[in-house]
């Protein structure tokens, strides 16, 4: 997945800034259909986005799914080129402008996502990644978001330096790895007319599910994922603390060795003997490699996302609970009368 955009030419060499993403209804329907089909098998759905760049708007007009990774006989690069070549023959936009993937329990931030978008953005400057949340959309809230890597994140990945010092220098945190790009859905006038006619034919929704309080499974999934991420972050913290303890012990040993050498050199100087250089002692203490903090940063971002989703979900559930209680009290009062 990480190098699927690696061999495509840049679509535009001028300004690579995208102010917003405009997605056709057809492309949205194809993404939604693919993501929901793969979610039934607990697989991650991924695909390519096709379109063009107009001024500072990225227009997504079509898309197609990537072949499943389990098919070893499939050449992914050749598959993509073949699909785009055939789309070009029928006069369909065939420029590769990004990719999409489904989301797992409302959380899409991962190391694989970061690597893939880095390869796309360094080869296709205007590319975006569109994330579709299947679980939230299944509850009636269409969740479609577009992201791009920030310049700081791209620079950090180019340098290949994920140490704490690099994060501080570039001022990179989990909240500044990706920048969300506004996304709008556009339909043709004929599509809007058809949707209006279909809306009149559909039966009116009575709205009896709006106050449904059966939300235990959704909250349980978020809590389980949150606990797993917190445990991963704890393990990362333990490893980093061990590194700091080793560095502190090494510095203490080096300082004691240098102090001992200074005393010995003072004795040698008083006797007129040549002194020993400090570099001989320093060579004995090799600097410890600094552990990368990228995984911990991504895990922190996942924890933050799950916490926000839980807070939002609980506030909605509490509102439903109070409304239901008021309706129940009103019903009981009416029955008493």
UniProtKB/Swiss-Prot annotation:
Keywords tagged on the record: Cytoplasm, Initiation factor, Protein biosynthesis
Localization of this protein: Cytoplasm
A Pfam family this chain is assigned to: eIF3h_C
UniProt keyword Magnesium, yes or no: no
Biological process annotations from GO: formation of cytoplasmic translation initiation complex
Any one GO MF annotation of this record: metallopeptidase activity
GO CC list: eukaryotic 43S preinitiation complex; eukaryotic 48S preinitiation complex; eukaryotic translation initiation factor 3 complex
Domain MPN span(s) in chain numbering: 21-153
Quaternary organization: Component of the eukaryotic translation initiation factor 3 (eIF-3) complex. The eIF-3 complex interacts with pix. Interacts with mxt.
Name of protein: Eukaryotic translation initiation factor 3 subunit H
Organism encoding this protein: Drosophila pseudoobscura pseudoobscura (Fruit fly)
Taxonomic placement: Eukaryota, Metazoa, Ecdysozoa, Arthropoda, Hexapoda
Gene from which this protein is expressed: eIF-3p40
